[in-house]
């Protein structure tokens, strides 16, 4: 009798007749097969067992008495015969389908309580379950490929005897075909091995020792270099990288931003975009590595139990995570330095997550360029915001402006220049031509006009200074002439007062430029107001002092130049001039306020006369008095003791004759004779 079940029935029990043999196949694609010869040899070896003979007979006669739990199970054909598990009549109700499934798939049978009778599991049953191979899962713990190949070859050619049953001793020979059975014996032995726990503990100690050593080395390296921090748990490298130290990038970012050109700014922005791409690539590679490690961990846990892969994978995860974290921190530090050099805000947050992708970076860059272009321009709210921005790109404008200033004297590009500029800026030739037309009108022409105006102003200033200079010189010449006239006019008056009968020879010596229209008397001179111009007096005084120190061009000597060298006992030789005479001489002529007793050049004749009067007393020259023109009263010689003077015509005539008969050469000779006395 054949039965076919759709799906997965919860429990399979034998029929009442006890002759039903069933085979439970969880994976029909890996069913076990054997040939007719194997069946015959199996029947010959087990001929003493009647139950086994009945099973073989039923198997040969009823090839379709099987139960398939999969709807896609293949239909049996004449060339294939399946192994059936014989079930006796009294054991059919006690053994369930779960036990058969566990036996076929290599798991130890579970003790289940049945409603139909007691159930006992024989130790050989467990051994058969452990020795029955499972389907291969693609995992092997062997370290050598040769051993694995030898083991698989040994399993292919070595038959496995599975025996179960308490007293009947049914044996079924299962031969592994070329496709291989399910599972290697090594995995089943690992599960039931008593050395598994001890080996795992020993491996944990070795791995922990190595990890502690590596932690110490990494801490020492981080203290010296400062590039990598302490170890962090697995999974924090992608989320918490770059939090504490950023290495050389932070040092480079410590500098203050400087003014950058357009080319330098574009280069830094391109570098920043490349760094952001590298950062995303690093994160993607770490996620891929983490997924692969999770697959390995799940394979370990499936083979050796939950938590068994920690000893094998923890060290590798920590090492690789440290490398990824250091790489990410370095890239994040360089991005931060680029942001500071550009004067932008940091795009790396405090926890180290890079905020924003390449799209956000491009959007931020476009917004910044738009803000710079519209700087200082306030748009009315009624303007349409959706209207596209007018004007050429800033980079193209900078290139065109640079060419304009380089060829400022002739800003008319040729066709070749226009093609070259169009390639550099990415514009068309017509756009370049239009820009230069507008630039010459709006930029170049106003600059040229402004330069021309400044040049004209400078020329006007230069012409004004050149016209002003001759006028100033003429004014200064006139002022100097008037000053010289003021200086020379008192000399002429004094000479006239001193020499009323002089024929004019002394006037040429003193340098008078013209004769006065009328003669001045001492009374008129006394009535003139005193000039208080102290600046002209100071100039004249300095000039007089300079002339006192030198020798005159006509050979004469100043009277007062050597006056300070006389002895006190020699002062009696000079005449005594009254205070009125001094005042009259001081304030005479053009109101210049210069005293004539300071040693003016025209006083030489007077000094010589005085000296001649002292040396020649027999001539009867009156001392200390002055003869005025048209004065009828004549005075006689004055005495120093203050006595009265007698007026006689003889004395006046003698005085006039002596005055007119004076010789200038004799005066000079007399002065030359007195030089040794003055010097001594």
UniProtKB/Swiss-Prot annotation:
Polar residues composition bias: residue spans: 471-488
- Write out the entry's keywords from A to Z: DNA-binding, Homeobox, Nucleus, Transcription, Transcription regulation
Alphabetically, the GO molecular function entries are:
DNA binding; DNA-binding transcription factor activity; protein heterodimerization activity; protein homodimerization activity
Localization terms from the record = Nucleus
User: Where, by residue number, does the polypeptide cross the bilayer?
Assistant: none
Q: Locate the region SR/KY domain.
A: 193-209
Q: Which CDD domains match?
A: homeodomain (cd00086)
Gene3D superfamilies attached to this UniProt entry: Homeodomain-like
Q: So which domain of life are we looking at? A: Eukaryota
Output one GO BP term.
polar nucleus fusion
**What's the domain remark here?**
The SR/KY and BELL domains are responsive for the interaction between the TALE/BELL proteins and the TALE/KNOX proteins.
* Family note: Belongs to the TALE/BELL homeobox family.
UniProt name for this protein = BEL1-like homeodomain protein 1
Q: Could you tell me which species this protein originates from?
A: Arabidopsis thaliana
